């Protein structure tokens, strides 16, 4: 780029700037903003650039030395030159809603303002930031000093020392301005006037909190008079994936006279070892009849057998690009690069020749205390958690992330889909702006600047044109621009149907494994069917799937079975990473996590912002364990039981197993019988068949026999501690046949009869059944009462988010499970005891009770309990029942009762240790588990059914001992309180602890959260049932 020697033109005054109303104009995406470029540091030493040492020419302005003047509308001109009396110290970066100004708004689809594009409300909250700084004389006297804002929401005008500098919109990409003409000795003052709403807001309708302010870092950068203004680095591998080339394109900014004698050098390093270097004078070959680019240089370096970059092996090189005048170094810039080749071949997305399996997740930039301000420590925390839980990819949903994010993904190893900051979900139709050429400049700026800013990062393997904006000519045009300007990466875009001509990858959201969703104009086929449609040859990667809202992620293992079975189903990105809740002190003084509506924000979409695999503070949900297991890199097959042989397959594409040990154990009823370990030595994509035991000999009477295998990493890695578990699997083994001897019981329990109760006594045990209600109302041991409530049938659960769907008070969805249960009267059934008989049998006393559950006058459920009391203090309870066919499938069939709290851990023989449900239990293992009572609850922010453990054979908690085959939960919260409480921090302590025993429990679903997503096999569709449990209290 050539620059002239002339001075700066006259700048408009404050009133003229505001009179233009740039924030209402979608064609004005910026004024005086510098062209987008990769992150610069302007080192003046080549080795400092190589070693990424702090640059004296780049200074961060973050901190508390700034002030903010809030206004409901545009402020007076005094803010340009002075801090007003109502200004307040405000940290930069921050969202001003998190600092006590204005309210955050959470909406999913609906725009938070009236839909009148491109204009926005006249009442437009505006914050004027005042930032003070000083610069060295050398910065003012030589070169160019830039101010760089990494992120400002949503648009801003900039003044320096009272003089207008420029304007920018697009809240998620850096905006740089030349401050050189405005600087003065000593103190310099910036005024940044930030508007909450702008024309750009119509392109930023993402499912997130709507916040404002300077929320990313601010930098000062001093570049020399002749300077690098853009550098594009394209590492590539040859067709054999053996040797590499580094293609370099650099653009210089200087006067025409100064261009002569300049040259650009490139050196490539790993640590202190140099692998390649070259230098070339400015000027390109002739382009056309008008000549060549005098200010640009294009050349390549050959690199023999470079180490490849992948998420498994993130081998980074340091590319140092230098600008020279003769032998004088003017400037050095440097970036981490990686040699890898992304291509779509034979219908498969391939990296370095191998088909990828995307273990992905969508991630918003969100922090529960700081809003959308995310620090490097926060980023590292997310990356480590993702890597530890077998994720290899992340989609930047739905906007480019802070620049440091990509640098970290390069180093730690994550594949990134970089997505343009474009979403118009609330438009009707959705493509209203996408198909309007008047909006092409705004669309174009967001896509092209994203690419120009981020294209040097090896972690970015796919560009995305945005999210949920429909299909239109603007996206078509930008697809073709991308294919011309960066042919090294594929492009994806879901809008308009997920398989349009503007995407290289079929990338639907929430398509099911099998079931079609024939949505008008944009049908979603089952993913197996989609790849088999006539003429369709593209890979399919779900840009969003497995909506992880609250207690969810059912059916997740089904997706991964399909991914492994069909090569062109190459994975997907779970929605989403973290619950977007905000820590708040509520009006009553309580502190908890807030969601939509908790700040008086209207419109709002309530708790729909909480779809994470982790809580806002990054504490994992149980569903994260399910995701980790389904995505694990090792697969296991049981080949035979005697000898005990298994096959282990590595799904690593690029790394051998150089830090993996297999540990195995055979257990019977939770007791270890055999165990061992061995070192895995597998090549990439390798497998091995291993004999664990030559002969499996089990003791007589052994039951519940399981083989457990797990792969751990003995040595710490860059992203995990030593002994990190990366994979595990269980297999049931056949148990030897055996006959159980019936117990030798003492005398029969006594049966004491009165008009009101049946009373059964056996030693210190005393049970009391109310003959009117049929309920076991009292159970005393040694005169001490055990029950706080009677044992009762339980047919309901506190509705999950997936049960509620989109149903709200003002907008009922009759298809939602909660509405079907409500309209069927399930929450208001009346129990009437129609039978309560007692008799003494040969070895026990039997109480036989039957209840009719009425909906009005109609019997809709019949429940029959046979309570067998034995002299050893055992209650064996056999339950059978049936429901009317007019009732929808029930959420559960079981019983519950409340008992006094005990200071004892909960121990069980069954699936665990984490919460699991019938359609989300692949990751749970059968064993003897023990956990404190507090760990048996999952405190979902919006309270719901939680804490279940499935397929249990024995439960022991203090004096309580329960056996049979059942699912259970033990927690200090009643179903009723869970149903009636809208935030977890409002849950109140109850008198005791509730034990729930389920014979049957419906799945949780999770393909999405707005349609009934529980698969048929996990519905309680049967109209008859039976189960049996035995209870003892000692």
From Swiss-Prot:
<dbReference type="GO" id="GO:0030246">
    <property type="term" value="F:carbohydrate binding"/>
</dbReference>
<keyword id="KW-0915">Sodium</keyword>
<feature type="binding site">
    <location>
        <position position="611"/>
    </location>
    <ligand>
        <name>Na(+)</name>
    </ligand>
</feature>
<feature type="binding site">
    <location>
        <position position="468"/>
    </location>
    <ligand>
        <name>substrate</name>
    </ligand>
</feature>
<dbReference type="Pfam" id="PF02836">
    <property type="entry name" value="Glyco_hydro_2_C"/>
</dbReference>
<dbReference type="InterPro" id="IPR006103">
    <property type="entry name" value="Glyco_hydro_2_cat"/>
</dbReference>
<feature type="binding site">
    <location>
        <position position="1010"/>
    </location>
    <ligand>
        <name>substrate</name>
    </ligand>
</feature>
<feature type="active site" description="Nucleophile">
    <location>
        <position position="544"/>
    </location>
</feature>
<dbReference type="GO" id="GO:0005990">
    <property type="term" value="P:lactose catabolic process"/>
</dbReference>
<keyword id="KW-0479">Metal-binding</keyword>
<keyword id="KW-0378">Hydrolase</keyword>
<dbReference type="InterPro" id="IPR006102">
    <property type="entry name" value="Glyco_hydro_2_Ig-like"/>
</dbReference>
<dbReference type="InterPro" id="IPR036156">
    <property type="entry name" value="Beta-gal/glucu_dom_sf"/>
</dbReference>
<dbReference type="GO" id="GO:0000287">
    <property type="term" value="F:magnesium ion binding"/>
</dbReference>
<comment type="subunit">
    <text>Homotetramer.</text>
</comment>
<feature type="binding site">
    <location>
        <position position="604"/>
    </location>
    <ligand>
        <name>Mg(2+) 2</name>
    </ligand>
</feature>
<dbReference type="InterPro" id="IPR008979">
    <property type="entry name" value="Galactose-bd-like_sf"/>
</dbReference>
<keyword id="KW-0460">Magnesium</keyword>
<dbReference type="GO" id="GO:0004565">
    <property type="term" value="F:beta-galactosidase activity"/>
</dbReference>
<feature type="binding site">
    <location>
        <position position="108"/>
    </location>
    <ligand>
        <name>substrate</name>
    </ligand>
</feature>
<dbReference type="InterPro" id="IPR032312">
    <property type="entry name" value="LacZ_4"/>
</dbReference>
<dbReference type="Pfam" id="PF00703">
    <property type="entry name" value="Glyco_hydro_2"/>
</dbReference>
<dbReference type="GO" id="GO:0009341">
    <property type="term" value="C:beta-galactosidase complex"/>
</dbReference>
<feature type="binding site">
    <location>
        <position position="611"/>
    </location>
    <ligand>
        <name>substrate</name>
    </ligand>
</feature>
<dbReference type="InterPro" id="IPR013783">
    <property type="entry name" value="Ig-like_fold"/>
</dbReference>
<dbReference type="InterPro" id="IPR023232">
    <property type="entry name" value="Glyco_hydro_2_AS"/>
</dbReference>
<feature type="binding site">
    <location>
        <position position="207"/>
    </location>
    <ligand>
        <name>substrate</name>
    </ligand>
</feature>
<dbReference type="InterPro" id="IPR011013">
    <property type="entry name" value="Gal_mutarotase_sf_dom"/>
</dbReference>
<feature type="binding site">
    <location>
        <position position="423"/>
    </location>
    <ligand>
        <name>Mg(2+) 1</name>
    </ligand>
</feature>
<dbReference type="InterPro" id="IPR004199">
    <property type="entry name" value="B-gal_small/dom_5"/>
</dbReference>
<feature type="binding site">
    <location>
        <position position="425"/>
    </location>
    <ligand>
        <name>Mg(2+) 1</name>
    </ligand>
</feature>
<dbReference type="InterPro" id="IPR023230">
    <property type="entry name" value="Glyco_hydro_2_CS"/>
</dbReference>
<comment type="similarity">
    <text>Belongs to the glycosyl hydrolase 2 family.</text>
</comment>
<feature type="active site" description="Proton donor">
    <location>
        <position position="468"/>
    </location>
</feature>
<dbReference type="InterPro" id="IPR023933">
    <property type="entry name" value="Glyco_hydro_2_beta_Galsidase"/>
</dbReference>
<dbReference type="Pfam" id="PF02837">
    <property type="entry name" value="Glyco_hydro_2_N"/>
</dbReference>
<dbReference type="InterPro" id="IPR014718">
    <property type="entry name" value="GH-type_carb-bd"/>
</dbReference>
<protein>
    <recommendedName>
        <fullName>Beta-galactosidase</fullName>
        <ecNumber>3.2.1.23</ecNumber>
    </recommendedName>
</protein>
<dbReference type="Pfam" id="PF02929">
    <property type="entry name" value="Bgal_small_N"/>
</dbReference>
<dbReference type="InterPro" id="IPR050347">
    <property type="entry name" value="Bact_Beta-galactosidase"/>
</dbReference>
<keyword id="KW-0326">Glycosidase</keyword>
<dbReference type="InterPro" id="IPR017853">
    <property type="entry name" value="Glycoside_hydrolase_SF"/>
</dbReference>
